[in-house]
Amino acid sequence: MTAKLKRGITKVKDPGSALTHFIAMILAIIAAIPLLSKAGHDSGHMHISALAIFILSMIGLYAASTIYHTLDISPKINKLLRKIDHMMIFILIAGTYTPVCMIVLGDKTGWTMLTLVWGIAIVGILINALWITCPKWFSSLIYIAMGWVCILAITKILSSMPRAGFMWLLAGGIIYTAGGIIYAMKLPFFNSRHRYFGSHEIFHLFVRGESLCHYVMMYRFVA
């Protein structure tokens, strides 16, 4: 093991962000237990699988972010980890849609929307993988558009879910959209003076807020 590689593994690149993402990952793992236990009492395999996809997408995002903010091996590896971090956002959005489409809707509308959302996620991942200089605003535009695909089935969702559940779904979407706009516009303007707390970190704070809202929705109204 070279000295540079050893230093990159043993020295944390961004301690603050690495710690907060690690805590979020642990909380997501813990949160999986009551969610899946509740679903397991009265639900079938498809019901449990849909919720498992949601919780695994959340854990995967925070795990990828933890690794990205922890390791500092080389510019090439850092770029790869950053891309994976960004790709996992597509997985999280699609993973959040999965229980809504499979359980709340559960009909042709739900399966059509599920196919559309995962299709967009795959396209977004390929764009991030192949377009080396993909600008933040473009990725953010896809994130936000993907997050609001549910508008296409808004009437069906409202009729299939209690109003309180829909409000949690809506709150998560609004919080996520606000974070996406901040990320796309590279806000706040003090980025250059705050090395470890810029638009990327603020975006992830909003993502955690979105995760919390949607977890509450899943636990109370879907599981």
Describe each PLM feature range.
Residues M1-A223:
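Multi-pass alpha-helical transmembrane bundles in non-GPCR membrane proteins
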